[in-house]
Amino acid sequence: MKKYVIVTGGVLSGIGKGIFSASLARLMKEHGVDVNVLKIDPYLNVDAGTMNPNQHGEVFVTEDGYEADLDLGHYERFLGRDMTRQNNMTAGQVYLRVIEKERQGKYLGNTVQIVPHLTEEIKDRIRALEAELLVVEIGGTVGDIEGEVFLEAVRELQMEEGKENFLFAHVTYVPYLRTTNEFKTKPTQQSVQLLRRIGITPDMVIVRSEFPLDVPSMNKVALFSGVPRDFVINLPDTKNVYEVPEILRDMGLHEKIASKLNVELKKSTFNWSYPKAFKPYRIALVGKYLGTDDAYKSIIESVFLTGIEKPTVVDSQMLEDMNDEEVKKVLDEYDALIIPGGFGRRGVEGKIKAIKYARENKKPILGICLGMQLMVIEFARNVFGYKEANSTEFDPNTPYPVVDLMEEQKRILKLGGTMRLGAQKVKIFPKTKLYEVYGGVEEVYERHRHRYEANEEAFPELFKKPGEEGYKLVVSAKSDFIEAVELEDHPFFVGVQFHPEYKSKVGAPHPIFVYLRKVLEGSQ
């Protein structure tokens, strides 16, 4: 019989339900349990593809081309396995499917309602995921109007599948009031009471806090939540999220869950390896989304997993207003640059200035997706003298469209879910840095998310094959179009059309980030 851990949130959003869910799943996997994870997002978007990264964080792309919430990135990195579109459910998907069924006459003339039609659709999708143990994370907080139908659905599911097969874990937050030097548990108490009114009684309360809670506060949470004291778990802030699985292991979380759900655990050596000492290199992530690190989460974590301190986001718009000397003064403080993907013209000219600086000053630089396209634009402008060179994304009338909309994209009018997405085959050419990155492998699959491509057909003079003469961009990888470019006689000037950051895992960061570290160490 399938077992379920339902993770809900209270008091605040963004307090770590995703990290807790991923850590719990990894812990159970280490003890031989066949585990899977489902993230439920109560928003009405069909997927995360058109959402603003400043508001929602990065869009994570799966192997099968699904544009997902960033929590799926946590699941992949922690579990060391790929997620698919089945690992994410949104309210938009559920409503859309129910309306489609109604139009098809699937409800036989019944009045279509939240209960039972939406709740049945939700339960069917939850049941469809195969696993011995399914961890279901419900986004948002208890009390959000968008999430009520999902809480009702899991309440019904518990009744249908048996209470003995369910564990409800409520992740909440206890603030520390500095004016009185005490923790305040009242918001957590009220959050649990609200969950109970919906018909769900938590079996476990995970208390997030800035500092470790004192014993009286923990006892108070247990008393007013009606949860046994040993099922109230405090998770204070940590230096990095990769400590959390070890913390939960030391608390015996896996044993508590196995006991409650009657799951058999196998002995484990807990093979969990992440960097604990860091090289003192400074990497500038030249981007425009400054509100939160979540906008570039997978890049930041990929760098961190190589044993380098997390990159600093440098405002590309700030660089736009600077001359070359001012740009140099800012970027000289860093050992390497990363130009990430993105959309729209805001901040683009600042990124191009950063690329010019890196090219002229032999500073290691990695361009990702848009970053690679901007490398082509910078080279066309400043080496070939095509001063008006641009992408048709930013200037549809440019006389030098060195980056252009892919041919198959020109017939597409909708934005959502229509880009070139997911894992695509990439051919790597020998005698290039990228060939060294992959250890001599000539064919790989990498994840993509783009509509535009380097316009090699119209501007072949910008590019050359490995080993050819002339100061041009070396095409180091191709599919039906250019997948990567680099420069000879430069420590590391590499641009890739794909997103390597999506494939990094704990203990196995993507090789391009590992190679960048080796360049900084002087070993390449």
UniProtKB/Swiss-Prot annotation:
The residues that the entry says bind UTP are S13, K184, T185, K186, P187, T188, Q189, K220
What CDD domains does its record include?
Answer: CTPS_N (cd03113), GATase1_CTP_Synthase (cd01746)
Residue ranges occupied by any Glutamine amidotransferase type-1 domain in the UniProt entry: 282-524
Please tell me one Gene Ontology term that the record gives under cellular component: cytosol
Pathway(s) of this molecule: Pyrimidine metabolism; CTP biosynthesis via de novo pathway; CTP from UDP: step 2/2
Sites binding ATP sit at G14, I15, G16, K17, G18, I19, D71
Disulphide bonds in the chain: none
Q: Name one GO biological process term.
A: CTP biosynthetic process
InterPro entries, sorted: Class_I_gatase-like, CTP_synthase, CTP_synthase_N, GATASE, GATase1_CTP_Synthase, P-loop_NTPase
Q: Which parts of the sequence bind CTP?
A: S13, D144, I145, E146, K184, T185, K186, P187, T188, Q189, K220
Q: What residues bind Mg(2+), as annotated?
A: D71, E137
Listed GO molecular functions?
ATP binding; CTP synthase activity; glutaminase activity; identical protein binding; metal ion binding
Enzyme class at the top of the EC tree: ligase
At the top level of its lineage, which domain of life is listed? Bacteria
Q: Which UniProt keywords apply?
A: ATP-binding, Glutamine amidotransferase, Ligase, Magnesium, Metal-binding, Nucleotide-binding, Pyrimidine biosynthesis
TM segment ranges: none
Q: Which residues form the active site?
A: C369, H499, E501
Q: What else is known?
A: CTPSs have evolved a hybrid strategy for distinguishing between UTP and CTP. The overlapping regions of the product feedback inhibitory and substrate sites recognize a common feature in both compounds, the triphosphate moiety. To differentiate isosteric substrate and product pyrimidine rings, an additional pocket far from the expected kinase/ligase catalytic site, specifically recognizes the cytosine and ribose portions of the product inhibitor.
Q: How does it assemble?
A: Homotetramer.
Outline what the protein does.
Answer: Catalyzes the ATP-dependent amination of UTP to CTP with either L-glutamine or ammonia as the source of nitrogen. Regulates intracellular CTP levels through interactions with the four ribonucleotide triphosphates.
Put simply, this protein is called: CTP synthase
Organism encoding this protein: Thermotoga maritima (strain ATCC 43589 / DSM 3109 / JCM 10099 / NBRC 100826 / MSB8)
Task: Give the taxonomic lineage as stored in the record.
Answer: Bacteria, Thermotogati, Thermotogota, Thermotogae, Thermotogales
Gene that this polypeptide is encoded by: pyrG
